[in-house]
Amino acid sequence: MEELQGYLEKDRSRQQHFLYPLLFQEYIYTLAYDHGLNGSIFYEPMEILSYDNKSSSVLVKHLITRMYQQNYLIYSINDSSQNRFVGHNNYFYSHFYSQMVSEGFAVIAEIPFSMRLVPSFEEKEIPKSQNLRSIHSIFPFLEDKLSHLNYVLDILIPYPIHLEILVQILQCRIQDVPSLHLLRLFLHEYHNWRSFITSNKSIYVFSKENKRLFRLLYNSYVSEYEFLFIYIRKQSYNLRPTSSRAFLERIHFYVKIEHFIIVCHNYFQKTLRFFKDSFMHYIRYQGKAILASRGTYLLIKKWKCYLVNFWQYYLYFWSKPYRIHINQLSNYSFYFMGYISSVLINPSAVKNQMLENLFLVDTVTKKFDTIVPVIPLIGSLSKAKFCTVAGHPISKPVWADLSDSDIIERFGRICRNLSHYHSGSSKKQSLYRIKYILRLSCARTLARKHKSTVRNLLQRLDSGLLEEFFTEEEQVICLILPKTTLFTLHGSHGERIWYLDIIRIDDLANSLDWS
């Protein structure tokens, strides 16, 4: 606890006190809406609203001018339900401006975290490589580790029971009272916050609006709860993690710390010896985490009970036991990062001969396996209006007004992205089915536009349409083997490939509804 208190005292000197005036600076909104910006340390650049760069500067100037007016922010947010600005009935909508402010606030709120993380990265001399950000790099790690483990905890991250908890977590970094009040306004006035906090689906399904702000809050919140896991690991193994980062809330912390001291003295030393496991691995992506162990079922069950009780009673996080599932790797599979993963057991017999004696030795090998969840993926395609619920391709009427090249390019890009991300699947047949759905949906969309039949359209555009749906690795194979057809390509290309340039899950794979 002395080490923890020393960390808190040292960290207070880095708190930011004057962030609110930055909301009146035009360059802040340029950073928030720069689609090519790679400076964000938490997430990728994204499209917020569809407007061109020429009009965006005009919008920002109008916004800053009105923000200088007294109580404008309060009026604009409260007036968002009426969809108009104060004094402007037919001009820009209040909802649009308040969304711009929230995105600018998110950029400002990132500053304290970036000031803390960037120096630590420089001290550790982490090379500036895009490959370090690839989420596909997690799967080779799982291949290497999970085949030697027995159980896995499949965890859905608990969510806070009150919005004020999110504000308090940010108070560890932001002491600017006006900024915190503005954050409370956004959380309580927007209609979509409830789906973000109390959704029955996985918590990483964020609201479509104010993504940057909500993701900042979510990352801060998850860092708070993960500190508990890091602390337990330190106490049980007496090892100092070198790659962990923890953000702790300071407000009301000393109320919690009294309970923490009691637990440490009266409970930790007696129970942590039951949690010693040198083969324990924890991996999280967005709202899903897995905790894998080589220990027994009793040990992993203790971890589950311990985490649930500690989250609920000492950190005031609402976590229900059914959000944590215990799976034996040899008998069950688990869903993580768009794949259904499992550990396959392959028994085999080895013939050995020593002198004149011949005998058989039964051996068992374990292999980490990943496959594409085809049924949920078809469900995502159905929601996006590419096919029916049964998986029958249909046309996309909303794209029928585009040019032929734009339609083919859009379908081809979706197909290539899905193929690129799911290239690590050990069973390619389900992936080929998805590509078939997208290709035929593209053909039916073009046929709908030209009022023709799919057969006639495919005869006219088959070669060009097929090339658009080739992935990079398939194009390389076709260059090496010019006589390779599509069907022989499907049969020969069955190896799993993990790419080091994938920094996010495809939107269709990310929207899978798994309970």
Curated annotation (Swiss-Prot):
Keyword Plastid recorded: yes
HAMAP family the UniProt entry points to: MatK
Keyword tRNA processing assigned: yes
Compartment(s): Plastid, Chloroplast
Disulfide-bonded cysteines: none
GO BP term (any one): mRNA processing
Main subcellular localisation: plastid
Record keywords: Chloroplast, mRNA processing, Plastid, RNA-binding, tRNA processing
Family that this chain belongs to: Belongs to the intron maturase 2 family. MatK subfamily.
Origin superkingdom: Eukaryota
GO molecular function per UniProt: RNA binding
Protein name (database record): Maturase K
Function: Usually encoded in the trnK tRNA gene intron. Probably assists in splicing its own and other chloroplast group II introns.
Source taxonomy: Eukaryota, Viridiplantae, Streptophyta, Embryophyta, Tracheophyta
GO cellular-component term (any): chloroplast
